[in-house]
């Protein structure tokens, strides 16, 4: 079975410079009532969903090895409706950092999203849409902080204990902009999986319900988002 990810753009780059600036998102204003009803329905389905604040991108370019851009703050209900409805405003992007977690034996690990999450059942690298915790006092979106925070929250692993790849990988799938950083552990895939599962077992509401080992294309699964498959295909090309 083929799990190829067509029309996916992958670019290697070195640095991220994204400002956080005020911006009026017309989609969120024009469809306010529909958005509120949609979120209420989604929250009835998954009561753990919370309408917090998130950061989205409204402009970007990669130039001279640097990803430049402008981001804005909005609420999660706006983001969720925009995503669930197929990106009706194609000038906005869901940018996020993702940890391409690699074991010492060369296998990669992905997590199965827990039933309480909006992406239940999907197989993801540790990642998450940035929120105000990832904004510096100088109004810069720090996606390195976003990466470290999501990795720690979802796996219990400190980024400083892992060997970081030299560059970022930009993977665009429609309005999803995944910024992946390879992080290599000292443990084998099996030992790393066991360690993360112990962490998940200590959490009251873990974001992952299981950890899968991916040793090659034969382990691809339809529950993997296109950006995960595209990144791994590029690794094993």
Regions found by a protein language model. Name each.
Residues 1-125, 129-149, 157-237:
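N-terminal leader/linker segments that precede catalytic domains of diphosphate-processing enzymes
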Residues 154:
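Short alpha-helical functional segments enriched in proximate histidine and acidic residues
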């Amino acid at each position: 079975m083929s799990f190829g990810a067509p029309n996916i753009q992958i670019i290697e780059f070195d640095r991220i410079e994204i400002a956080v600036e005020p911006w009026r998102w017309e989609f969120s204003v024009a469809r306010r009532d529909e958005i509120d009803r949609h979120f209420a329905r989604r929250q009835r389905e998954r009561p753990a969903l919370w309408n917090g604040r998130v950061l989205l991108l409204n402009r970007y370019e990669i130039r001279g090895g640097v990803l430049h851009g402008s981001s804005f703050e909005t609420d999660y209900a706006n983001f969720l409706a925009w995503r669930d409805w197929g990106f009706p405003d194609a000038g906005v992007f869901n940018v996020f950092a993702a940890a391409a977690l690699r074991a010492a034996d060369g296998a990669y690990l992905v997590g199965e999203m827990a039933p309480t999450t909006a992406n239940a059942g999907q197989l993801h690298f540790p990642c998450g849409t940035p929120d105000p915790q990832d904004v510096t006092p100088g109004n810069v979106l720090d996606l390195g902080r976003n990466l470290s925070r999501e990795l720690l929250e979802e796996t219990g692993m400190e980024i400083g204990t892992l060997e970081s790849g030299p560059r970022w990988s930009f993977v665009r799938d429609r309005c999803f902009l995944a910024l992946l950083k390879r992080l290599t552990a000292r443990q084998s895939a099996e030992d790393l999986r066991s360690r993360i599962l112990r962490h998940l077992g200590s959490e009251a509401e873990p974001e992952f319900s299981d950890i899968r080992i991916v040793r090659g294309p034969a382990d691809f699964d339809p529950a993997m988002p296109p950006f995960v498959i595209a990144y791994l295909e590029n690794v094993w090309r």
